[in-house]
Design a protein with these regions (language model features):
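Conserved N-terminal segment of class I S-adenosyl-L-methionine
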Residues: 9, 16-19, 43, 74-254, ...
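S-adenosyl-L-methionine-dependent methyltransferase catalytic module, highlighting the catalytic core
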Residues: 98, 253, 260-352
Length: 352
Protein backbone atom coordinates (compact mmCIF):
# COMPACT_ATOMS: atom_id res chain seq x y z
CA UNK A 1 0.00 0.00 0.00
CA UNK A 2 1.23 3.49 -0.89
CA UNK A 3 2.39 5.22 2.30
CA UNK A 4 0.33 8.32 1.41
CA UNK A 5 -2.82 6.22 1.08
CA UNK A 6 -2.06 4.47 4.34
CA UNK A 7 -1.52 7.79 6.07
CA UNK A 8 -4.84 9.12 4.72
CA UNK A 9 -6.68 6.01 5.87
CA UNK A 10 -5.14 6.28 9.33
CA UNK A 11 -6.15 9.93 9.56
CA UNK A 12 -9.69 9.23 8.38
CA UNK A 13 -10.12 6.32 10.78
CA UNK A 14 -8.87 8.46 13.67
CA UNK A 15 -11.20 11.30 12.69
CA UNK A 16 -14.17 8.97 12.45
CA UNK A 17 -13.50 7.52 15.88
CA UNK A 18 -13.43 11.04 17.28
CA UNK A 19 -16.68 11.77 15.45
CA UNK A 20 -18.32 8.68 16.94
CA UNK A 21 -17.16 9.73 20.41
CA UNK A 22 -18.73 13.18 19.77
CA UNK A 23 -15.40 15.03 19.82
CA UNK A 24 -16.49 17.00 16.79
CA UNK A 25 -13.89 19.75 16.97
CA UNK A 26 -10.97 17.32 16.98
CA UNK A 27 -12.57 15.21 14.24
CA UNK A 28 -13.12 18.25 12.03
CA UNK A 29 -9.53 19.38 12.49
CA UNK A 30 -8.27 16.11 10.99
CA UNK A 31 -10.94 15.90 8.28
CA UNK A 32 -10.02 19.34 6.97
CA UNK A 33 -6.55 18.01 6.14
CA UNK A 34 -8.08 15.29 3.94
CA UNK A 35 -10.27 17.40 1.64
CA UNK A 36 -7.81 17.22 -1.27
CA UNK A 37 -7.26 13.48 -0.91
CA UNK A 38 -8.29 11.64 -4.08
CA UNK A 39 -10.23 8.97 -2.16
CA UNK A 40 -10.90 10.15 1.38
CA UNK A 41 -11.69 13.73 0.40
CA UNK A 42 -15.31 12.93 -0.45
CA UNK A 43 -15.83 11.09 2.83
CA UNK A 44 -14.18 13.91 4.74
CA UNK A 45 -16.68 16.35 3.22
CA UNK A 46 -19.52 13.98 4.11
CA UNK A 47 -18.54 13.61 7.78
CA UNK A 48 -17.95 17.35 8.04
CA UNK A 49 -21.53 17.68 6.81
CA UNK A 50 -22.65 15.37 9.60
CA UNK A 51 -20.76 17.46 12.13
CA UNK A 52 -22.24 20.72 10.81
CA UNK A 53 -25.77 19.31 11.03
CA UNK A 54 -25.31 17.93 14.53
CA UNK A 55 -23.74 21.14 15.80
CA UNK A 56 -26.52 23.34 14.44
CA UNK A 57 -25.43 24.63 11.03
CA UNK A 58 -27.75 22.87 8.55
CA UNK A 59 -26.96 25.13 5.59
CA UNK A 60 -23.23 24.44 5.92
CA UNK A 61 -24.13 20.76 6.15
CA UNK A 62 -26.10 21.02 2.90
CA UNK A 63 -23.10 22.48 1.06
CA UNK A 64 -20.76 19.84 2.48
CA UNK A 65 -23.04 16.90 1.64
CA UNK A 66 -23.38 18.11 -1.95
CA UNK A 67 -19.64 18.69 -2.21
CA UNK A 68 -19.08 15.08 -1.13
CA UNK A 69 -21.44 13.87 -3.88
CA UNK A 70 -19.84 16.12 -6.49
CA UNK A 71 -16.38 14.77 -5.65
CA UNK A 72 -17.58 11.16 -5.61
CA UNK A 73 -21.03 10.68 -7.24
CA UNK A 74 -21.16 6.99 -6.24
CA UNK A 75 -20.29 7.86 -2.64
CA UNK A 76 -22.86 5.49 -1.17
CA UNK A 77 -21.23 2.37 -2.55
CA UNK A 78 -18.81 2.63 0.38
CA UNK A 79 -21.31 3.97 2.92
CA UNK A 80 -24.18 1.51 2.53
CA UNK A 81 -24.40 -2.27 2.54
CA UNK A 82 -24.96 -4.03 -0.81
CA UNK A 83 -28.51 -4.97 0.19
CA UNK A 84 -29.51 -1.34 0.82
CA UNK A 85 -31.97 -0.05 -1.84
CA UNK A 86 -29.79 3.00 -2.52
CA UNK A 87 -26.43 1.22 -2.57
CA UNK A 88 -26.07 1.83 -6.31
CA UNK A 89 -27.21 5.47 -6.26
CA UNK A 90 -25.11 7.79 -8.41
CA UNK A 91 -25.47 11.56 -8.07
CA UNK A 92 -26.07 13.25 -11.43
CA UNK A 93 -26.69 16.80 -10.24
CA UNK A 94 -29.31 18.70 -8.29
CA UNK A 95 -32.88 18.58 -9.60
CA UNK A 96 -35.18 21.57 -9.47
CA UNK A 97 -37.57 21.44 -6.54
CA UNK A 98 -40.26 23.98 -5.68
CA UNK A 99 -39.21 26.15 -2.72
CA UNK A 100 -41.57 26.21 0.26
CA UNK A 101 -41.46 29.91 1.00
CA UNK A 102 -43.19 29.90 4.40
CA UNK A 103 -44.68 27.70 7.09
CA UNK A 104 -47.63 25.82 5.55
CA UNK A 105 -49.62 26.27 8.77
CA UNK A 106 -49.28 30.00 9.48
CA UNK A 107 -47.53 31.54 6.48
CA UNK A 108 -44.67 32.96 8.55
CA UNK A 109 -40.99 32.48 7.76
CA UNK A 110 -39.15 29.53 9.23
CA UNK A 111 -35.48 28.90 9.94
CA UNK A 112 -33.32 25.95 8.84
CA UNK A 113 -33.13 23.41 11.66
CA UNK A 114 -31.77 20.15 10.15
CA UNK A 115 -30.13 18.84 7.00
CA UNK A 116 -29.85 15.14 6.12
CA UNK A 117 -28.43 12.99 3.29
CA UNK A 118 -31.62 11.09 2.54
CA UNK A 119 -30.14 8.17 0.58
CA UNK A 120 -29.47 6.42 3.87
CA UNK A 121 -33.21 5.91 4.35
CA UNK A 122 -34.13 2.30 3.60
CA UNK A 123 -37.83 2.60 2.95
CA UNK A 124 -40.06 4.54 0.55
CA UNK A 125 -37.22 6.55 -0.95
CA UNK A 126 -38.17 8.37 -4.14
CA UNK A 127 -35.19 8.89 -6.42
CA UNK A 128 -36.92 11.85 -8.04
CA UNK A 129 -36.02 13.83 -4.93
CA UNK A 130 -32.71 15.53 -4.36
CA UNK A 131 -30.41 13.44 -2.13
CA UNK A 132 -30.17 16.11 0.58
CA UNK A 133 -33.12 17.45 2.59
CA UNK A 134 -33.20 20.68 4.61
CA UNK A 135 -35.95 20.97 7.21
CA UNK A 136 -37.33 24.34 8.31
CA UNK A 137 -38.68 25.18 11.77
CA UNK A 138 -41.54 27.59 12.51
CA UNK A 139 -41.29 28.80 16.09
CA UNK A 140 -44.79 30.31 15.95
CA UNK A 141 -46.43 26.95 15.19
CA UNK A 142 -43.78 24.63 16.65
CA UNK A 143 -43.88 22.92 13.27
CA UNK A 144 -41.25 21.55 10.89
CA UNK A 145 -41.56 21.45 7.10
CA UNK A 146 -39.46 20.72 4.00
CA UNK A 147 -37.44 23.57 2.51
CA UNK A 148 -38.35 22.45 -1.00
CA UNK A 149 -40.23 19.65 -2.72
CA UNK A 150 -40.54 18.18 -6.24
CA UNK A 151 -43.51 18.99 -8.44
CA UNK A 152 -46.39 16.54 -8.02
CA UNK A 153 -46.10 15.09 -11.53
CA UNK A 154 -42.43 14.28 -10.90
CA UNK A 155 -43.36 12.54 -7.67
CA UNK A 156 -46.01 10.43 -9.33
CA UNK A 157 -43.51 9.12 -11.91
CA UNK A 158 -41.58 7.43 -9.14
CA UNK A 159 -44.23 6.29 -6.73
CA UNK A 160 -45.07 2.77 -7.89
CA UNK A 161 -41.68 1.27 -7.05
CA UNK A 162 -41.11 3.45 -4.03
CA UNK A 163 -44.39 2.56 -2.36
CA UNK A 164 -44.68 -1.07 -3.43
CA UNK A 165 -44.15 -2.46 0.07
CA UNK A 166 -46.68 -0.05 1.54
CA UNK A 167 -49.56 -1.66 -0.33
CA UNK A 168 -49.35 -5.08 1.24
CA UNK A 169 -51.95 -6.06 3.79
CA UNK A 170 -50.38 -6.46 7.23
CA UNK A 171 -52.74 -8.71 9.17
CA UNK A 172 -50.90 -8.01 12.43
CA UNK A 173 -52.58 -4.58 12.45
CA UNK A 174 -56.13 -5.93 12.46
CA UNK A 175 -56.36 -6.01 16.27
CA UNK A 176 -55.28 -2.40 16.56
CA UNK A 177 -57.84 -1.17 14.04
CA UNK A 178 -60.52 -3.17 15.82
CA UNK A 179 -59.57 -1.27 18.98
CA UNK A 180 -59.55 2.07 17.14
CA UNK A 181 -62.94 1.51 15.53
CA UNK A 182 -64.47 0.41 18.82
CA UNK A 183 -63.17 3.59 20.43
CA UNK A 184 -64.52 5.73 17.58
CA UNK A 185 -67.93 4.12 18.01
CA UNK A 186 -68.02 5.70 21.45
CA UNK A 187 -68.19 9.13 19.81
CA UNK A 188 -70.77 8.42 17.11
CA UNK A 189 -73.51 5.88 16.50
CA UNK A 190 -73.12 6.24 12.74
CA UNK A 191 -71.68 3.43 10.63
CA UNK A 192 -70.60 5.22 7.45
CA UNK A 193 -66.80 5.28 7.24
CA UNK A 194 -64.45 6.96 4.77
CA UNK A 195 -60.75 6.18 4.68
CA UNK A 196 -58.42 8.55 2.85
CA UNK A 197 -55.13 6.85 2.01
CA UNK A 198 -55.87 3.13 2.02
CA UNK A 199 -52.36 1.73 2.41
CA UNK A 200 -52.67 -2.02 2.88
CA UNK A 201 -56.45 -1.75 3.49
CA UNK A 202 -56.15 -3.08 7.05
CA UNK A 203 -58.55 -0.52 8.51
CA UNK A 204 -61.28 -0.84 5.88
CA UNK A 205 -61.12 -4.64 6.01
CA UNK A 206 -61.66 -4.62 9.77
CA UNK A 207 -64.38 -1.98 9.39
CA UNK A 208 -66.28 -4.21 6.96
CA UNK A 209 -66.05 -7.13 9.39
CA UNK A 210 -67.42 -4.89 12.16
CA UNK A 211 -70.41 -3.90 10.03
CA UNK A 212 -69.42 -0.44 8.79
CA UNK A 213 -70.46 0.94 5.40
CA UNK A 214 -67.01 1.60 3.94
CA UNK A 215 -65.66 3.80 1.14
CA UNK A 216 -62.04 4.59 0.28
CA UNK A 217 -60.17 7.33 -1.56
CA UNK A 218 -56.51 7.04 -2.55
CA UNK A 219 -54.19 8.97 -4.84
CA UNK A 220 -52.31 5.73 -5.56
CA UNK A 221 -53.79 3.25 -8.02
CA UNK A 222 -52.09 0.43 -6.11
CA UNK A 223 -54.16 1.15 -2.99
CA UNK A 224 -57.41 1.41 -4.94
CA UNK A 225 -56.69 -1.83 -6.80
CA UNK A 226 -56.03 -3.63 -3.52
CA UNK A 227 -59.31 -2.35 -2.03
CA UNK A 228 -61.26 -3.48 -5.08
CA UNK A 229 -59.57 -6.87 -4.90
CA UNK A 230 -61.13 -7.22 -1.44
CA UNK A 231 -64.53 -6.06 -2.70
CA UNK A 232 -64.29 -2.61 -1.10
CA UNK A 233 -65.61 0.42 -2.96
CA UNK A 234 -62.79 2.90 -3.60
CA UNK A 235 -62.01 5.82 -5.89
CA UNK A 236 -58.69 6.85 -7.42
CA UNK A 237 -58.52 10.52 -6.53
CA UNK A 238 -56.55 13.22 -4.78
CA UNK A 239 -58.92 13.72 -1.88
CA UNK A 240 -58.57 17.50 -2.14
CA UNK A 241 -60.25 17.18 -5.57
CA UNK A 242 -62.80 14.66 -4.30
CA UNK A 243 -66.27 16.15 -4.85
CA UNK A 244 -69.34 14.62 -3.23
CA UNK A 245 -72.49 15.64 -1.41
CA UNK A 246 -72.17 12.62 0.86
CA UNK A 247 -71.13 13.05 4.50
CA UNK A 248 -69.51 10.44 6.73
CA UNK A 249 -69.77 9.49 10.39
CA UNK A 250 -66.11 8.48 10.65
CA UNK A 251 -63.10 9.54 8.61
CA UNK A 252 -59.77 7.71 8.86
CA UNK A 253 -56.79 9.84 7.82
CA UNK A 254 -53.80 7.74 8.74
CA UNK A 255 -50.29 8.94 7.84
CA UNK A 256 -51.48 11.26 5.09
CA UNK A 257 -51.23 14.79 6.47
CA UNK A 258 -47.42 14.74 6.49
CA UNK A 259 -47.54 14.34 2.69
CA UNK A 260 -49.84 17.26 1.80
CA UNK A 261 -48.76 20.74 0.72
CA UNK A 262 -51.49 22.60 2.60
CA UNK A 263 -52.42 20.82 5.85
CA UNK A 264 -54.92 23.53 6.81
CA UNK A 265 -56.96 23.08 3.63
CA UNK A 266 -56.84 19.33 4.18
CA UNK A 267 -58.29 19.58 7.68
CA UNK A 268 -61.01 21.99 6.48
CA UNK A 269 -61.86 19.49 3.73
CA UNK A 270 -62.15 16.70 6.32
CA UNK A 271 -64.41 18.90 8.43
CA UNK A 272 -66.71 19.45 5.45
CA UNK A 273 -66.84 15.72 4.65
CA UNK A 274 -67.94 14.79 8.18
CA UNK A 275 -71.47 14.83 9.51
CA UNK A 276 -72.07 17.25 12.38
CA UNK A 277 -71.78 14.41 14.89
CA UNK A 278 -68.92 12.81 12.98
CA UNK A 279 -65.48 11.88 14.28
CA UNK A 280 -62.01 12.09 12.76
CA UNK A 281 -59.08 9.74 13.43
CA UNK A 282 -55.66 10.68 12.15
CA UNK A 283 -52.06 9.67 12.68
CA UNK A 284 -48.74 11.25 11.77
CA UNK A 285 -45.12 11.30 13.00
CA UNK A 286 -44.38 13.63 15.94
CA UNK A 287 -40.92 15.22 16.08
CA UNK A 288 -41.51 15.98 19.76
CA UNK A 289 -42.35 12.36 20.63
CA UNK A 290 -40.46 10.56 23.37
CA UNK A 291 -39.06 8.21 20.71
CA UNK A 292 -37.80 11.06 18.52
CA UNK A 293 -36.28 12.97 21.44
CA UNK A 294 -34.32 9.90 22.54
CA UNK A 295 -33.14 9.05 19.00
CA UNK A 296 -32.23 12.62 18.05
CA UNK A 297 -30.23 12.67 14.82
CA UNK A 298 -30.89 8.96 14.36
CA UNK A 299 -34.63 9.61 13.99
CA UNK A 300 -35.46 7.97 10.67
CA UNK A 301 -38.29 10.40 9.90
CA UNK A 302 -35.72 13.14 9.35
CA UNK A 303 -34.61 11.17 6.27
CA UNK A 304 -38.13 10.63 4.91
CA UNK A 305 -38.16 12.71 1.73
CA UNK A 306 -41.76 11.91 0.82
CA UNK A 307 -42.89 13.94 3.85
CA UNK A 308 -43.55 17.65 3.44
CA UNK A 309 -44.47 18.22 7.09
CA UNK A 310 -43.22 16.99 10.44
CA UNK A 311 -45.81 17.81 13.08
CA UNK A 312 -45.53 18.16 16.82
CA UNK A 313 -48.37 17.42 19.22
CA UNK A 314 -48.74 21.19 19.65
CA UNK A 315 -48.85 22.04 15.94
CA UNK A 316 -51.32 19.25 15.11
CA UNK A 317 -53.76 19.89 17.95
CA UNK A 318 -53.63 23.65 17.37
CA UNK A 319 -54.37 23.14 13.67
CA UNK A 320 -57.34 20.89 14.44
CA UNK A 321 -58.79 23.43 16.86
CA UNK A 322 -58.28 26.31 14.42
CA UNK A 323 -60.21 24.35 11.79
CA UNK A 324 -63.21 23.64 13.99
CA UNK A 325 -62.30 20.35 15.67
CA UNK A 326 -62.05 19.41 19.33
CA UNK A 327 -59.29 16.84 20.00
CA UNK A 328 -60.67 14.27 22.44
CA UNK A 329 -58.02 11.54 22.49
CA UNK A 330 -54.25 11.27 21.98
CA UNK A 331 -52.30 8.00 21.79
CA UNK A 332 -48.87 6.77 20.75
CA UNK A 333 -48.88 4.61 17.64
CA UNK A 334 -48.16 0.94 18.43
CA UNK A 335 -46.76 0.33 14.94
CA UNK A 336 -44.79 3.42 14.01
CA UNK A 337 -42.39 4.53 16.77
CA UNK A 338 -42.57 8.28 17.19
CA UNK A 339 -46.01 8.64 15.62
CA UNK A 340 -49.18 9.94 17.28
CA UNK A 341 -52.83 8.99 16.85
CA UNK A 342 -55.50 11.62 17.50
CA UNK A 343 -59.30 11.51 17.65
CA UNK A 344 -61.20 14.76 17.11
CA UNK A 345 -64.88 15.69 16.91
CA UNK A 346 -66.51 18.68 15.26
CA UNK A 347 -66.86 21.74 17.47
CA UNK A 348 -70.58 22.07 16.65
CA UNK A 349 -71.27 19.77 19.61
CA UNK A 350 -70.17 22.44 22.02
CA UNK A 351 -72.45 24.96 20.36
CA UNK A 352 -75.72 23.06 20.74
Amino acid sequence: MDSTVGDSKSKYDSAYKLFESEDYEAAAEILLTLLEDSFYGAYAYFVLGEISNITGDPLAAKDLYYKALEVKPDLYVNLLSPDHPNYDYVFTGMKYETPVEACPLCGKSGEPIWCYPTMRFKSLHLRNHNPVRVWMYCKDCHHIYAEEFPEQEVLESGTDLAYANMFKTNTSRFDHYSFVLSKLSGFTEGRELLEIGLGGCECVLVAVELGFDVFGVDIMDTGVALAKKYGIEAELQDFMSFETERKWDIIIFGDVIEHVSDPRKSIVKLYDLLKDDGVLWLSTPNFDSAFSVVNGHDDGMRLEVSHKNYFSRISLLDLLEQCGFVPVDYQLSPYFPGSMEVIAVKDVRGND
